[in-house]
Curated annotation (Swiss-Prot):
One of its GO terms (molecular function) is helicase activity. The heterodimer acts as both an ATP-dependent DNA helicase and an ATP-dependent, dual-direction single-stranded exonuclease. Recognizes the chi site generating a DNA molecule suitable for the initiation of homologous recombination. This subunit has 5' -> 3' nuclease activity but not helicase activity. Despite having helicase-like domains, this subunit does not have helicase activity. This is ATP-dependent helicase/deoxyribonuclease subunit B. GO terms for biological process: double-strand break repair via homologous recombination. Its cofactor is Mg(2+). Heterodimer of AddA and RexB. Coiled coil: none annotated. InterPro entries: ADDB_N (IPR049035), DNA_helicase_suRexB (IPR014141), P-loop_NTPase (IPR027417), PDDEXK-like_dom_sf (IPR011604), PDDEXK_AddAB-type (IPR038726). Belongs to the helicase family. AddB/RexB type 2 subfamily. It holds the Pfam family PDDEXK_1. It is an enzyme of class 3 (hydrolase). The gene is rexB. Keywords: ATP-binding, DNA damage, DNA repair, DNA-binding, Exonuclease, Helicase, Hydrolase, Nuclease, Nucleotide-binding.
Length: 1179
């Protein structure tokens, strides 16, 4: 037995020296057996490297080399090697996920004994953290008794007592529970026992690339030193520390402490300690050697003479604008180097923390077509299998809530039979829309035997598009059947399960019978076929983790009474700590890692990115279950062979060593960079002290890594075709912004890209630089195909066209509609109001009555049954969905009663009576009403206008039927002459014309057009409050009346007249004392004025139809002054992307006109159409 140290700083070749010693031992005795131990994550690389070196020393002629006496292993694989046939190794393995599950169980069962951790069993984040802490304690050889001893040594009032006491209780239970399992600590302990009892006199053990050991690993190494023929430990250390450990500041602090511990232990065991050997220097560039000197002198606070700049060309510093362009520049430089003969494996990219770069790594390296391996653990908690299992529990907890069911289905692991994935996705989208629109939720609705029916909620009878109801009904019922036939079955089995084993078995069988396991296999096979090993293994590892958790659950709680909540929490805790094991997809790839992970020093060029002052040195993390102060309390009570890793501020002492190893992993060149912008926190970064000191000591001027721009040379940004396309777009955009010509070289880039397979994308992106948000015009032939040669339109559609032509095209040409949602909108309440008012007034008319004939009590009794009947119709489900909605329905009933009661009061003051409600003119859908309005168009075809008048009030005279059009509105409306002139308020004039054209005897003569506000008015209390009068005023009709003189309006409000004067409380009418109209109180049009308005209205309708069929779809929203409501209130903002600030988008800005101005224009030439902006470009 004996102990040999191989020392040397990071400029030396430790692996080469070790290989020479291995070769010598192999040749010395044919019985000698070699175990070469390295950290697990570099085992494969180390094995390849060692065998290459041994082959070189053996001078194998044909290049083939095999060796069966050399084993390159990690500690875990060494345990397998010696223990694989023992009972200990056959025990179930307690991996991180299973360990977390076990700790969750312990927390739940021991909460009555605990103080501060009693309520943490449901906190999966804490459970994961606690599980790691317990594992660390066991690996550190620390027992519950050690914790109790520490607690006993504390004063009664010490703030750490409760925490350490709880941890001691939990650790005591944990030690008992892990007995049947093989843990890392138990395997290392078992390995120690085996090694003590075996003849290792011909066994030579080499340990390389270790700088620190856990207590369990230290015990194993000490046993090796005591029992093996010889143990050789290689340490990155500039000198030995036999008598005392190194003292900070010292660059080699971690390795020096390990040397001292092993040296003293060997000395105590009276094991011979060989003379230290020093590794030979490895080939390094001059700059890298100079960098190594700087590390030692700067860390040890020694003065250093400034170096010549020429010596330092192999060390580069750079400052990037942000993390994305920092990493992109690195990728570009690697791409250029490989084009000149380098290999991808020559490069290593390191960061202290990769988090700021994790999201962009795949995209950047794919853009440059560079194979890469990111050595970073990825959590498994978002895998579709995990999401599916979580969703099953959530569905049971929340009674088939929309979010939970859709989350389950969107995993795409549960599929209907005989439905391909494209059809499933389409059906799922339809179902998603249906659920959002109808608010369907709950097990009862999902499992009902009656099929669902797809329909347009509150169907718009004005919509003439084809109804896809049958196809979509089939789709939503396919999804409904899938859920109803699968999910309830499992949930019932969980409800009836007696033991944990029954519940676990039912979940596994359900996954099997529903095809989830088959779908996972399909995913794996597809990934393999695509050559995506990482994706393939992710699916396999997720399934393996799940089955391991299920087995562990069955082992731990299989015979116990089944507790569903506990089952869920244990699975969640297990998955929360599970990660994917990754392997490189190719041997020749760029490795991306963190400086905290040991790597073999085989790269030629190392890039260290993210060198900010918060990452280098790293900000110490002291947020574990046991913080640094508590670890020190514990350490004071422990013997030397029991300890925990350092945490908190003390770890900063070893930070220089970690970064030193990373920097010195390169043999030829180091590039150190940092981004100025912290994109995660939207703040500015500062350079690392290492960066600043290195710049000063080596006289380096940092380069600037900025995005490619107009002045960037092509040589500097040479990259893959896809990367060059990105750079071209940026440079061309900069040229356009600065109004400068694009250089011929950049123009040549675009020309070259157009000769590659990227030509379509290059053409599209280049076109985006000159893009203006101008939809142009539709070809008239296409417009006719969209709308028909004879246009059948409603007034509201034409108003939309005059407000925004492009929105009309989106809404009625492309038939784009916003996604309907399950909510009570103004349109819903408006539809209900219209339906109730129509039915009640129709009932009265059929009975030969009017509102003036009934009492307020009659109204109050009639409305609630009507509301109840109408809300049972399809489309009104929301009003019965919740107690709150039921309350709102009752409020709507009271509001309708108030509205009708007030109408009753109004009709007692007027001679006009409702003749019809919901009076249709023209054809709407399959129904026809009164004759519609129809005019020929200048270039052929006709425009046919349809509509529905909410209420038509009529007063019969001997020679005429004077009528008033009444339109119900949920907000207050007035007749605006300017709006009518510009075409954004065509409704009232069109309705008046439609009725005036109806043949009748005596003829219909317009008396007015009025808006009625459906509202629930509020009144301020006062002593002189008269509710009847105030309600009349609140419900006052607004609009216009038609008359030559006061006699024409005598029947409108019988409480006033031209003779008596006064002001109406129900219509916009007032008289002066002399009998003339008081125009401050009235809105009166003469018959001649009305005729001019109607002629202009007709011209607007014909003009709009002509423009629509001509393909005019300008994006020029109507605007008065500075208002922007046409855009801000539009459902299509995200499509239009209208932004006047660009200088390309413009409003159709018009002046607001008064009645006098409007009358002046329409009486001069009623057919004159106001100017509308229309872009000249063609679509």
């Amino acid at each position: 037995m004996g102990l040999q140290f191989i020392l040397g700083d990071a400029t030396t070749d430790h692996a080469g020296t070790m290989a020479t010693m291995v070769q010598a031992n192999l040749q010395a005795d044919s019985q000698n057996q070699i175990f070469y131990l390295v950290p697990n994550h570099i085992k494969f690389e180390a094995e390849v490297d060692l065998l290459k070196r041994l082959r070189a020393q053996a001078a194998s002629v044909n290049g083939v080399y095999a060796q069966n006496r050399v084993q390159v292993l990690s500690f875990s694989r060494l345990a397998w090697y010696f223990l694989k046939n023992t009972a200990l190794y056959q025990q179930p393995r307690l991996d991180r996920a299973s360990n977390t599950m076990l700790v969750a169980k312990i927390l739940g069962e021991s909460k009555e004994e605990l103080t501060i951790y009693a309520g943490e069993a449901h906190n999966t984040g804490f459970v994961t953290q606690l599980a790691d802490q317990l594992s660390e304690l066991v690996t550190g050889r620390i027992t519950a008794e050690d914790l109790n001893t520490t607690v006993a040594a504390l004063t009664p009032g010490d703030r750490h007592r409760a925490k350490l006491r709880d941890l001691g209780i939990i650790l005591d239970h944990y030690e008992a529970e892990i007995g049947p399992y093989a843990t890392n600590a138990s395997l290392l302990s078992g390995l120690q026992q085996v090694m003590r009892n075996q003849d290792l006199s011909h066994t030579f053990i080499y340990l390389n690339d270790f700088n620190v050991f856990s207590a369990s690993e230290t015990g194993l190494v000490e046993t090796m030193i005591e029992t093996a023929a010889e143990v050789t430990v290689s340490l990155v250390l500039n000198k030995p520390y036999p008598a005392a450990p190194p003292v900070a500041p010292n660059l080699f602090l971690p390795a020096g402490r390990l040397y001292h511990r092993l040296y003293q232990k060997a000395k105590t065991m009276k094991v011979p300690i060989r003379l230290d050997r020093f590794a030979k220097p490895r080939p390094l560039s001059e700059g890298m050697n100079h960098l190594a000197d700087w590390w030692q002198t700067s860390t040890n606070l020694q003065p250093q003479a400034p170096a010549q700049t020429a010596q330092n060309k192999e060390v580069e510093l750079a400052v990037a604008t942000d993390p994305y362009h920092e990493l992109r520049t690195v990728a570009r430089q690697i791409y250029q180097a490989v084009r000149q003969g380098a290999r991808y494996r020559d490069f290593l990219i390191l960061a202290r923390r990769l988090d700021p770069y994790a999201a962009v790594i795949p995209a950047i390296f794919e853009e440059f077509n560079i194979p890469q391996f990111t050595d970073l653990e990825r959590p498994m908690k978002d895998h579709p299998l995990v999401v599916l299992i979580e969703s099953l529990f959530a569905i049971q907890d929340h009674d088939y809530q929309y979010q939970d069911v859709m989350r389950l289905l969107h995993t795409e692991l549960l599929l209907p039979e005989n439905m391909d994935i494209a059809a499933f996705r389409d059906a799922l989208d339809t179902t998603d829309n249906h659920l959002v629109r109808t608010g369907i939720t709950g097990k009862k609705r999902w499992t009902q035997t009656d099929p669902w029916r797809y329909f347009q909620r509150n169907p718009n009878a004005d919509d003439s598009q084809l109804d896809p109801e049958a196809d979509k009904t089939a789709q939503i019922n396919a999804i409904k059947t899938l859920v109803a036939d699968t999910v309830p079955q499992l949930l019932r089995q969980w409800q009836t399960a007696k033991t944990g084993r029954e519940a676990a078995a039912s979940l596994y069988q359900w996954l099997q019978t529903t095809g989830v396991i088959d779908q996972l296999n399909v995913w794996r096979q597809t990934a393999n076929a695509d050559g995506d090993l990482s994706r393939s293994q992710a699916n396999e590892q997720a399934w393996d983790t799940f089955t391991q958790l299920l087995n562990d659950y069955a082992t731990i709680l299989g015979e116990a009474d089944f507790n569903r909540d506990q089952f869920r929490e244990l699975l969640a805790a297990g998955f929360a700590s599970a990660t994917y094991t990754q392997i490189p997809s190719t041997l020749d790839s760029v490795v991306i890692s963190e400086t905290g992970l040991v790597r073999l020093a085989k790269a030629k060029h190392v890039y260290v990115i993210g060198a900010t002052n918060t990452a280098m040195p790293d900000v110490p993390n002291d947020s574990g279950v046991l913080n640094s102060e508590e670890r020190q309390l514990l350490a004071a009570q422990l013997p030397d062979d029991r300890f925990l890793p350092e945490q908190g501020p003390t770890t900063t002492l070893g930070d220089p060593f970690i970064n030193y190893l990373g920097f010195m992993a390169a043999s030829e060149k180091l590039t150190l960079s940092y981004p100025m912008q912290n994109t995660q926190e939207n703040s500015e970064n500062q350079a690392s002290p290492y960066f600043r000191q290195l710049a000063q000591a080596l006289q380096l001027t940092p380069a600037t890594w900025a995005p490619a721009g107009l002045g960037t040379s092509l040589k500097a940004v040479l990259g893959s075709p896809r990367a060059m396309l990105s750079d071209f777009v940026r440079a061309a955009g900069e040229a356009q912004h600065q109004k400068l010509p694009l250089s011929r070289s950049w123009q040549g880039v675009l020309a070259s890209l157009k000769q590659t397979k990227l030509a379509p994308l290059a053409q599209k992106l280049a076109g985006s630089l000159t893009y203006q948000n101008n939809p142009g015009r539709l070809d008239p032939t296409l417009a006719v195909q969209l709308y028909g040669r004879d246009m059948n339109v409603s007034v509201s559609r034409l108003e939309t066209y005059y407000r925004n032509q492009f929105e009309y095209f989106l809404k009625y040409g492309l038939l784009l509609q916003p996604r309907p949602e399950f909510e009570l909108s103004p349109a819903d309440t408006g539809s209900l109001f219209h339906a109730v008012l129509d039915q009640y007034l129709t009932q009265l008319r059929d009975a030969g009555q009017t509102l003036a004939d009934v009492t307020a009590a009659d109204v109050a009794a009639a409305v609630p049954p009507l509301v109840a009947a109408i809300t049972k119709r399809p489309g009104y489900e929301i009003l019965g969905s919740t107690h709150r909605m039921a309350y709102l329905t009752s409020r709507l009933s009271r509001l309708l009663i108030q509205v009708l009661t007030n109408m009753r009061q109004q009709q007692r003051r007027t001679g006009f009576r409702p003749m019809r409600t919901e009076l249709q003119f023209g054809q709407i859908g399959d129904t026809r009403g009164l004759p519609g309005l129809s005019w020929p168009l200048p270039h052929g075809g006709r425009v046919n206008v349809r509509g529905k008048i909410d209420r038509l009030d009529v007063y019969r005279e001997s020679d005429a039927q004077r009528f008033m059009v009444v339109d119900y509105k949920s907000t207050q409306h007035r007749f605006d002459d300017s709006d009518a002139y510009y075409g954004i308020a065509l409704q009232m004039l069109t309705y008046v014309e439609a009725m005036a054209n109806v043949p009748a005897d005596p003829p219909f003569v317009p008396a007015g057009a009025l808006y009625f506000h459906l509202q629930d008015p509020k009144f301020k209390f006062s002593t002189d409050l008269d509710l009847d009068i105030d309600r009349l005023k609140a419900f006052k009709y607004l609009g216009f009346l038609v008359a030559k003189d006061g006699a024409d309006l005598a029947a409108v409000d019988k409480t006033i007249s031209a003779e008596t004067g006064g002001r109406s409380m129900m219509v916009p009418l007032g008289f002066k004392k002399d009998g003339a109209f008081n125009y401050n109180q009235s809105n009166i049009l003469t018959p001649e004025d009305l005729s001019a308005y109607l002629l202009h209205n007709q011209a607007l309708i014909i003009d709009a139809a002509s423009r629509i069929l001509a393909g005019d779809i300008a994006l020029a929203p109507f605007q008065y002054g500075q208002e922007s409501t046409v855009i801000s209130n539009s459902d299509y903002q995200s499509i239009m992307l209208f932004d006047p600030a660009t200088g390309f988008d413009h409003y159709n800005h018009v002046p607001k006109l008064k009645r006098k101005e409007v009358l002046g224009r329409v009486t001069t030439d009623p057919t004159q159409i106001p100017h509308h902006r229309q872009e000249d470009s063609q679509a």
